[in-house]
């Protein structure tokens, strides 16, 4: 389901790397422009992989964007917008959550894209909160680079080997640093299994 109105609606597009999250965000933003909605895109300032002033998918789809360090500044930027797209939401601080809530109260349609899990296979940053608050969630999958099955995990590689559990969570990169993997082929040396108690 794709909503074209702007009545305080939060859409979250999530999944592992190379699943098409940014591509789907760009598609929805372009459709909003076609529907003559005032539309802006936001990206974290630290995401400088492909373009400083655009959200760009790994496959090359793009939409002009404003790089942001402080999530609170989004409120001023989005004052006249009906549709607000936010890419790589997992890189923003928790301050993004009240900003999104205020955008929704101001009847904006907010479309967020971000990784649900970090390279360790654990919930990433503010994404669990945004997924819980969302009116609509789209979970995308990639293809495992090892076996070709459905991939739901992001594998970080350092010199061609799986990154260790205790490596830093955030490392901006693309094909040179990450692969999509299925549960069977996702490796995190040093990770201990945690059993949940009821």
Swiss-Prot record:
Any one of the GO CC terms: cytosol
InterPro entries registered for this protein in UniProt: P-loop_NTPase, Thymidine_kinase, Thymidine_kinase_CS
PROSITE patterns recorded: TK_CELLULAR_TYPE
Extent of the signal sequence: none
Sequence positions that bind Zn(2+): 144, 147, 182, 185
List of residues binding ATP: 15-22, 87-90
Broadest EC class assigned to this enzyme: transferase
Keyword entries, A-Z: ATP-binding, Cytoplasm, DNA synthesis, Kinase, Metal-binding, Nucleotide-binding, Transferase, Zinc
SUPFAM superfamilies in the cross-refs: Glucocorticoid receptor-like (DNA-binding domain), P-loop containing nucleoside triphosphate hydrolases
The protein's Enzyme Commission number: 2.7.1.21
Keyword Chaperone: no
GO annotation terms (biological process): DNA biosynthetic process; thymidine metabolic process
Reaction catalysed by this enzyme: thymidine + ATP = dTMP + ADP + H(+)
Single Gene Ontology MF annotation: thymidine kinase activity
Location of the active site: 88 (proton acceptor)
Compartment(s): Cytoplasm
Pfam families: TK
Family: Belongs to the thymidine kinase family.
Assembly with partners or alone: Homotetramer.
Protein name: Thymidine kinase
Gene: tdk
